[in-house]
């Protein structure tokens, strides 16, 4: 009897089999906000016969995952069932087309700094690197509340405490991913950023959980941003919980048309634009952002914009400011603050030693048309009664910043104040600049 071709694949590739179990992909949509012309993945793949189940593998699951992706590409589903999957080979999944990834198992990455120093996918921007990356068109990646990606962060943070130059990969990355959804995954203890969204468009990310816990006080978690978005547009991140030690979300250069909504962030540095303008001569653009309905607790800031100042005219090749570009059309609305140091921090003098030096070399990156609206809650005692900072390097490069409907109380109960510098024609009637 002639064996069906898919059974033959099972015989020749023991790590891969065709499963009769068809995981149920969630139906999710951007709500209540979305960018114009937003088009994430078209929904669950229709084929119920083309489901490639990858067997758990505690030596190296990467070959099995890669084989499944090739076999079930163009209309199928890759299924990682409950069990342990150790990835010990860098996994390039940037060829995907019309495919689902159902991750119900526990994914970890081999603890081997030398291995990942040579194998991880390297990016010049802020020396980011990735264990694995997803790219392609019309892709759904989902965990249904079962899947876990564990970065074993303490191993990497301890190594960094001994050698600050240790390369630490991000836990999940997209590079050239278009029309996609990512949902229902728990991510633990990332060595570096949890997620890098690069060179991608039309991605809906929903119902994610990200948790960081350091076990050694002398080797704390470092750089555990929830999401870093870089050279990407039409992105929605929503309905997720993040407990970390760095930015909850960070908009890196050339992030546009993005909605962030319904997040619960704890212990972070806030929802941050930047830092931008760090590299002399390079142009960074971040515009058309809507950040809505965020709960922020025990953070340094709720809403934050970080821009480097300019540099002296005779400077060449600076990596400490002098970059070009703009931050434009950014809205933070309906933000709940609990015990955060500042509710709003705008700095066009990021990493500058003092305001006088920053005033001498104003930023070449313009901030304009920014709205902070409807902030409620409390701040910490760190700057009491100051609840925010608005610092531009010159009124010539800082326009139309509006702060309104602020109902935030410092611990002392005194009238809240802001530090304000070079704000020019901004609309600050609803706050007190001290």
Curated annotation (Swiss-Prot):
Intracellular or extracellular location(s): Secreted
Pfam families registered for this protein in UniProt: Glyco_hydro_28
PbH1 repeat start and end residues: 232-253, 255-275
Matching InterPro entries: Glyco_hydro_28, Pectin_lyas_fold, Pectin_lyase_fold/virulence
Signal sequence region: 1-19
Glycan-linked positions: 46, 57, 106, 199, 207, 254, 293, 329, 354, 400
Catalyzed reactions: [(1->4)-alpha-D-galacturonosyl](n) + H2O = alpha-D-galacturonate + [(1->4)-alpha-D-galacturonosyl](n-1)
Record-linked PROSITE patterns: POLYGALACTURONASE
Principal subcellular localization: secreted
GO CC annotation: extracellular region
Enzyme class: hydrolase
Domain of life: Eukaryota
S-S bonds: 248-265, 392-398
Any coiled-coil regions, as ranges: none
This enzyme's EC code(s): 3.2.1.67
Record GO biological process: carbohydrate catabolic process; cell wall organization; pectin catabolic process
PANTHER family: EXOPOLYGALACTURONASE X-1-RELATED (PTHR31736:SF14), PTHR31736
Protein purpose: Specific in hydrolyzing the terminal glycosidic bond of polygalacturonic acid and oligogalacturonates.
Family of this protein: Belongs to the glycosyl hydrolase 28 family.
Listed name of the protein: Probable exopolygalacturonase A
Organism: Aspergillus niger (strain ATCC MYA-4892 / CBS 513.88 / FGSC A1513)
Phylogenetic classification of the source organism: Eukaryota, Fungi, Dikarya, Ascomycota, Pezizomycotina
């Amino acid at each position: 009897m002639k064996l069906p071709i898919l059974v033959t694949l099972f015989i020749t590739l023991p790590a891969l089999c065709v499963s009769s179990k068809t995981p149920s992909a969630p139906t999710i949509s951007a709500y209540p906000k979305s960018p114009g012309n937003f088009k994430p993945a078209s929904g669950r793949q229709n084929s119920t016969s083309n489901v490639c189940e990858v067997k758990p593998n505690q030596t190296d699951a990467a070959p099995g995952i890669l084989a499944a992706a090739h076999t079930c590409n163009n209309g199928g589903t890759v299924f990682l069932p409950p069990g342990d999957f150790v990835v010990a080979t860098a996994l390039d999944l940037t060829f995907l087309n019309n495919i689902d990834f159902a991750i119900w198992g526990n994914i970890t990455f081999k603890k081997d700094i030398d291995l990942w120093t040579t194998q991880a996918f390297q990016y010049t921007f802020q020396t980011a690197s990735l264990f694995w990356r997803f790219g392609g068109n019309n892709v759904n990646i989902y965990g249904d509340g079962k899947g876990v990606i564990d970065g074993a962060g303490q191993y990497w943070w301890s190594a960094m405490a001994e050698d600050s130059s240790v390369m630490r990969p991000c836990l999940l990355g997209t590079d050239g991913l278009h029309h996609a959804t990512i949902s229902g995954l728990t991510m633990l203890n990332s060595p570096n950023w949890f997620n890098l969204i690069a060179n991608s468009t039309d991605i809906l990310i929903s119902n994610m959980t990200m948790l960081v816990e350091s076990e050694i006080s002398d080797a704390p978690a470092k750089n555990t941003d929830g999401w870093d978005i870089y050279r990407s547009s039409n992105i929605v991140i929503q309905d997720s919980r993040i407990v970390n030690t760095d930015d909850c979300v960070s908009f890196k250069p050339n992030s546009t048309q993005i909605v962030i909504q319904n997040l619960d962030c704890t212990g972070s540095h806030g929802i941050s634009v930047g830092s931008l303008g760090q590299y002399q001569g390079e142009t960074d653009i971040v515009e058309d952002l809507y950040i809505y309905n965020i709960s922020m607790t025990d953070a340094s800031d709720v809403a934050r914009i970080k821009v480097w100042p300019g540099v002296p005219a005779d400077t060449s090749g600076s990596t400490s400011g002098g970059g070009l570009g703009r931050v434009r059309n950014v809205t933070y609305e309906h933000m709940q603050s609990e015990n955060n140091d500042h509710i709003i921090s705008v700095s066009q003098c990021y990493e500058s030693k003092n305001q006088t030096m920053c005033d001498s070399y104003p930023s070449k990156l313009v901030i304009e048309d920014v709205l902070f609206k409807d902030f409620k809650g409390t701040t910490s005692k760190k700057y009491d009664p100051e609840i925010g900072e608005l610092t531009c390097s010159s009124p010539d490069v800082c326009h139309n910043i509006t702060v309104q409907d602020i109902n935030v109380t410092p611990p002392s109960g005194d009238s809240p104040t802001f530090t304000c510098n070079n704000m020019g024609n901004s609309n600050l009637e609803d706050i007190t600049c001290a």
